[in-house]
Structures are given as C-alpha cells and as structure tokens.
C-alpha cells in the first residue's frame, strides 16, 4: 500500500492536526489530537508505532494514517479502536493491533456509519473486527483482517454493513461471519483464505447479500450457512 508523506486535503474544510511521536511540534499520540479536534478537523498520523487507545463517540471522524504498513496503533488494556454512534467520516491507512490477554477485538464498531479503508486489524483475542447494533452501517473496503483468535470480521445484533474488497486470512475461525435475526451485511468481492475453519459463516437467522467473494485454501469449507439463514442470490445459485 502506498505510504503518504503528506496529509491529503481535508474534505470537511477544517484544520489538519499532525501526530508524530518524534516531532515535538506535533501531537504525541492520536488520542491527544482527538481531544483537540473539532468536528470538521482531520488527524494525520505520520509513520510510527503508537501505544494508544482510541475511543470515538457521537461525533464524526477523519483519522488518516500514512499507511497500514507504516502506522501501527496497539493497546494492551483493551482494543485499540472503539467507535460508538459515529455518524460519518473516514479512517484509513492504519494497523490496529491488540496485544493484551483479555477478550478484546482490534476494531469495535457499534451503531456507526463511517468508512474504514486501507487498514489492518490483527491479533484480536475475539474477532479482528466486530460490527454490531441496529444502527450500525459502516463501509469496510480494502482492509486486511488477519491473525485473530476467532473470526476476521464478525457482524451481529442487526448490523447492516457494506463489506467489500477486504482480505481476511489466517484467522483461527472464519474469515467473515454473520449472526442473528435482522443482521444483513453486504459481502461483496472479499477474499477469505487460509483461515483455520471456513471462509464465510452465516448462522442463527442472519441474512446477507453475497456476491463475487473468493474463499480458498481454508482448513474446512469455503462457505457455510445454517438452513434458516437467507442469502441473495439464493444458496443454490452461489
């Protein structure tokens, strides 16, 4: 992935706050910049490894990293990224890594509607990315979700995200998973490979749009669904 040397233009028209632990004129950690950012401000994270915990609630977010191979945010005391009721915005170009011993995910998304692209979620003791809540409609595009102890991306509790062109691999359970009545993700053009169980799982009354996904080299099966689940197109046409 391309590494950004300079922040992109702020689409909201506000200021751009710089995070760089090696520059005394910049913010030392992303969470410090977030405390000072207005609703139209953008945060740009220069290359580096940052120990931090980012919690964003009830506000838009523009959080841009120099690239997922250049910027890592890790946390020992919980997941490094929590979004709650985030109405809009974008997060891109960052690796989120959980390094603790409790049951946490690398990305936790509750009832939010932002876009997450070009990121990496790794080493969660639960799934790498959990997406949940009846008002949860984020877009995840071109992310890597890997080396998590459960599934890569887990959608539940009536969430309806758009999940496209992500690569989910080397997770202990499934690449993509959906559960619960009212849950209805769009799984479009994702690649799930080398997961220890199957590529995609749907269970307990979940529904999903399932189009042009690739499931290969998983330990068990490519796509698994329990009988009460519904897919578009129907199972027999997948």
Task: Enumerate the language-model features and the residues they cover.
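Short aromatic-glycine-(Arg/Gly/Cys) micro-motifs in beta-strand/loop hairpins
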Residues: 2-20
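All-beta strand scaffolds that present successive hydrophobic residues in beta-strands
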Residues: 45, 62-65, 89-93, 114-117, ...
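Histidine/lysine/aspartate-rich catalytic loop segments that bind and position anionic ligands
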Residues: 136, 146, 158-162, 169
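Acidic, glycine- and Ser/Thr-rich low-complexity intrinsically disordered tracts
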Residues: 3-4, 12, 214-215, 219, ...
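Short glycine/acidic-rich loop motifs that flank beta-strands on beta-rich extracellular proteins
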Residues: 50-56, 68, 74-80, 100-106, ...
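Extracellular beta-strand-rich solenoid/capping regions of secreted or surface-exposed proteins
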Residues: 31, 36-39, 51-64, 72-112, ...
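Acidic Gly/Asp/Thr-rich repetitive segments characteristic of extracellular carbohydrate-active
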Residues: 15-51
């Amino acid at each position: 992935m391309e590494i950004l040397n300079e922040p992109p233009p702020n689409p909201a028209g506000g200021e751009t706050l710089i995070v760089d632990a090696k520059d005394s004129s910049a913010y030392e950690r992303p969470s410090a910049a977030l405390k000072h950012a207005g609703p139209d401000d953008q945060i740009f994270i220069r290359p580096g490894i940052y120990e931090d915990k980012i919690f964003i609630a009830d506000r838009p977010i523009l959080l841009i990293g120099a690239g997922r191979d250049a910027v890592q945010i890790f946390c020992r005391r919980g997941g490094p990224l929590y979004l709650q009721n985030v109405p809009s915005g974008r997060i891109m170009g960052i690796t989120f890594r959980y390094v603790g011993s409790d049951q946490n995910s690398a990305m936790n998304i509750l009832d939010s509607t932002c876009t997450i692209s070009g990121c990496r979620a790794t080493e969660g003791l639960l799934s790498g990315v959990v997406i949940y809540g009846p008002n949860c409609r984020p877009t995840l595009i071109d992310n890597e979700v890997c080396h998590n102890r459960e599934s890569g991306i887990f959608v539940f509790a009536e969430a309806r995200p758009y999940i496209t062109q992500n690569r989910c691999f080397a997770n202990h359970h499934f690449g993509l998973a959906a559960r619960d009545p009212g849950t209805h993700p769009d799984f479009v053009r994702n690649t799930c490979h080398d997961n220890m169980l199957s590529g995609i799982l749907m269970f307990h009354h979940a529904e999903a749009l399932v189009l042009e996904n690739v499931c290969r080299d998983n330990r068990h099966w490519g796509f698994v669904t329990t009988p009460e689940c519904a897919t578009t197109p129907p199972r027999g046409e997948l």
